[in-house]
């Protein structure tokens, strides 16, 4: 019998979540099968995933029509659809949540991307989503923007599970884990239990390589006379995201060894795990599981789209690699400053955050528009 590498990865301390959710996979039993037999122990969703699930799918039409008859505005109809899917997915994952002592079994749902730069609106929506969905194993996604992190701190203090999303730079990750720590400290100071709260920090991968590879390709296209310069550029291609992630993991290790974290751990606090996101390979020249193989290790999560789950189950090469090649990772990131390469990684990360928010705003607005069209069709004349 062939080895299912997804189950093998779990033995190295990494949880595999799925970056996909739709009513189809819930009702068909596919999600239940993935959870019970394939080792999937969490779900992440985002506005792009919901647009794909809902926009051209008749499975939602009866609920849309019910919302129209009830006189609900389009946005409330949208929420009724996604909240129902989130609740059902939470129920399927509840046994995992219980069996893992609340480490896994979460379903992530993002606050509206249109409020990414509004702290108070993010806090309000996170509270409302958590209360209205009404499942302990729901995890609210909050973008790791300057405005998002104070919201993370506050909702953690209130006992809400948080997935901090759209993290690209190591510094943004460091800021995120400290926001989590401050939230726990605030909750502890109020005499409340901190042992039941979970959080992950979603660190994005493939988008970094797409951006930097594009810059390298542009340099190569302009022509490079020196063979050694061409070699320098080629060494960087497809390597920056993984190097960046390995450095972030080193920062994680430093922080959890600190006295400040150890004081919280003594009270039962769960570590905020790094979650590798954007893990499907976009370049056909790269391995379709490279963002899995290279980042397996303790206290991590990898959220995979369905195609990558299938590929990984088939041919991942499972080993603890998140802590290998660390010196080389630092060297690679440092090499971007070389005048011959001259890529400002901080500028790239800032660019990717702005782009990342837009990539969620656009499908969110597109879905609102398509829902509005359905609402008009189904409304009584």
Curated annotation (Swiss-Prot):
EC class, as a word, reads: transferase
Show the Gene3D superfamilies listed in the entry.
Aldolase class I (3.20.20.70)
- Give compartment(s): Cytoplasm
Functional pathway: Carbohydrate degradation; pentose phosphate pathway; D-glyceraldehyde 3-phosphate and beta-D-fructose 6-phosphate from D-ribose 5-phosphate and D-xylulose 5-phosphate (non-oxidative stage): step 2/3
| Main localization (coarse) | cytoplasm
Gene Ontology cellular component annotations, sorted alphabetically = cytoplasm
Q: Which GO terms describe its molecular function?
A: transaldolase activity
For this protein, what reaction is catalysed?
Answer: D-sedoheptulose 7-phosphate + D-glyceraldehyde 3-phosphate = D-erythrose 4-phosphate + beta-D-fructose 6-phosphate
Biological process terms from the Gene Ontology for this record are: carbohydrate metabolic process; pentose-phosphate shunt
Classification via Pfam families: TAL_FSA
Which keywords does UniProt give here? Answer: Cytoplasm, Pentose shunt, Schiff base, Transferase
* Protein EC: 2.2.1.2
Family per similarity comment:
Belongs to the transaldolase family. Type 2 subfamily.
Annotated PANTHER family: TRANSALDOLASE (PTHR10683:SF31)
**Which protein are we looking at?**
Transaldolase 2
Native species = Nostoc sp. (strain PCC 7120 / SAG 25.82 / UTEX 2576)
